Amino acid sequence: MVTVRNTRKDVVTAAGRLFAEKGYHGTSMRDLGRELGLLGSSLYAHVESKQDLLVEVVEEGARLFQASADAALATEGSAASKLRQLIAGHVGVVVDNPDIVRTYLNEARMLDPEHRGRVIAARDGYEQAFRQVIALGSSDGSLRPDADPKLDSIFLLSILNAIERWYRPQGEVGVAELVDEVSEFALGALRP
């Protein structure tokens, strides 16, 4: 039996799940209504459009990643320690919010230009946290002096973003082990 849920949060959560599973174009408002136990037209009492839902899911992904970066940057310690915190925060967001993250990483390109621009700016701000920490590490001695903050951030975020494709909580690798392995891999490449 389908339980009828009708809060906006329920609608956005269901949209994130369906966008993650079927993609933006593969998800219809009818699919979403069925998921929520609503008639298609009833859905419009909660949202203006499917694009509106995509915006909410993707912007939530951006907020979650930025909050994890802000927390990491607020910690005490060397840049290497902050980088480990950035990695742990990213992994935590991916593991705790798989549907939002999958939609953020894979479906943001489906946003209209205005919203895409905002999300790109948010993504750039998040990436800047990694660049900032790597640059700090080059100057405080905890990371290689010749590290390239821009390229090394791209490399590291490529690894971190790929986790959503293969990681399964019920699999052989636990979250703590995943954080340790990615951190050691990254820091192994960046230590002096």
Residues of each region from the PLM?
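N-terminal intrinsically disordered/low-complexity leader segments
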Residues: 1-6, 17
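Helix-turn-helix
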Residues: 10, 14, 18-52, 56
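Hydrophobic/aromatic residues within well-ordered alpha-helical segments
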Residues: 50, 57, 61, 65, ...
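Short secondary-structure transition hinges
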Residues: 52, 92-131
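Hydrophobic alpha-helical connector segments
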Residues: 56, 70-100, 149, 153-156
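Amphipathic alpha-helical packing segments from all-alpha helical-bundle domains
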Residues: 63-66, 114-140, 150-154, 177
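C-terminal peripheral helix-coil segments that are non-catalytic and often amphipathic
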Residues: 92, 96, 128-140, 157-159, ...
